[in-house]
């Protein structure tokens, strides 16, 4: 029997630690050497931090290497501000985040440390040198001209990087580190990036999660297209956990007092640093109150826009597998490892404190134990 095997990783920022712990436990129990994961899967797919993990495993790195990478982002004083090598350094206050979303044109973080990390991991290796096939989503932003109008506008194009020479896939000769940086350039968090080989005018690339945060279905489709004679496809899909992306508060829609707490910070900032009168300060604060409140709604909608399609794909594959549907005479065996976090926990994409990292490890251990029979 010919079997297609696929391993897929969701995006999720620092919550990717959840995926890394799963792979550690999975390899341990399956007797797979951690640095030889690539030998067991025809395709490894991943988006954002999941893309970094996919590229790492396809390069011969182990789950322990990935766990070490995540833990290296931790700050020693548990407040996000004392680890200059962290990819989320320097820290960004709640007030700065709100102000950037509403009025700024800069991202919260620069990608200098992320670039250094990826260069240290992948060096000058190119995609075609990876040890197994990979599939890495991203999105290209470029300038185009509206026909008969002559106006330049920004256009968007979903991109699938791969080392496979196949229709719809690209990037076989790109540096692995460039692909990793591209798929993880989360809007608002990190700036869009250039890839030297791409010559489209004003072309830049952003996080693949904007296109497809869960690439499991893509891995399935391309696996079957490349190996159509297989009788069975087995997909292992690894999530990063479902929680809040509220950025400022563990509660998805914070109560008015939370919003006003940040307004008070802003009020004090105006009084102390701008030397505005009390009357002028109150005028400014009252004028932006609706904007502050709308930030939370905006971020909840962003969260839904990412997690909704992600979980829809999970449900489709789950049902196809459950009811024994045959596509091109191929059986589908599908398992997804994921969890739902306590909504009272801070599960931001850029949370790096020790409490968070310990919580993620515990969540992975508990979910692995709960799914023990399924995993076997």
Each predicted region: which residue ranges?
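Conserved catalytic cores and adjacent C-terminal regulatory segments
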Residues: 1-376
């Amino acid at each position: 029997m010919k079997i297609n095997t696929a391993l897929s990783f969701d995006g999720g920022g620092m919550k990717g630690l959840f995926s890394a712990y799963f792979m550690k436990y999975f390899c341990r129990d399956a007797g797979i050497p951690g640095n030889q994961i690539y030998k067991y899967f025809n395709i490894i797919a991943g988006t954002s931090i999941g893309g970094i993990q996919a590229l790492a495993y396809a390069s011969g790195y182990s789950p322990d290497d990935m766990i070490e990478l995540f833990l290296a982002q931790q700050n020693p004083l548990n407040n996000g501000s004392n680890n200059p090598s962290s990819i989320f350094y320097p820290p960004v206050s709640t007030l700065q985040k709100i102000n950037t979303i509403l009025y700024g044109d800069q991202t919260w973080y620069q990608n200098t440390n992320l670039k250094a990390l990826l260069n240290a991991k992948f060096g000058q290796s190119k995609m075609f040198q990876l040890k197994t096939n990979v599939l890495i989503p991203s999105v290209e932003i470029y300038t185009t001209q509206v026909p008969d109008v002559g106006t330049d506008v920004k256009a968007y194009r979903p991109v699938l990087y791969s080392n496979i020479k196949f229709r719809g896939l690209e990037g076989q000769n790109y540096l692995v580190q460039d692909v990793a940086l591209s798929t993880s350039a989360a809007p608002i968090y990190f700036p869009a990036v250039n890839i030297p080989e791409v010559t489209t005018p004003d072309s830049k690339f952003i996080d693949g999660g904007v296109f497809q945060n869960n690439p499991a279905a893509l891995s399935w489709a391309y696996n079957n297209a490349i190996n159509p004679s297989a009788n069975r496809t087995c997909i292992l899909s690894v999530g990063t956990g479902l929680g809040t992306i509220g950025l400022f508060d563990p509660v998805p829609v914070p109560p008015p007092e939370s919003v006003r707490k940040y307004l008070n910070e802003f009020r004090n900032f105006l009084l102390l640093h701008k030397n505005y009168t009390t009357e002028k300060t109150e005028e400014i604060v009252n004028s932006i109150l609706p904007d502050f409140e709308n930030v939370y709604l905006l971020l909840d909608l962003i969260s839904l826009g990412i997690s909704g399609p992600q979980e829809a794909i999970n449900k489709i594959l789950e049902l196809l597998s459950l009811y024994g549907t045959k596509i091109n005479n191929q059986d589908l065996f599908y398992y997804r490892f994921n969890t739902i976090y306590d909504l009272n926990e801070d599960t931001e994409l850029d949370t790096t404190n020790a409490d968070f990292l310990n919580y993620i490890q515990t969540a992975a251990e508990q979910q692995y134990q709960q799914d023990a029979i399924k995993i076997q």
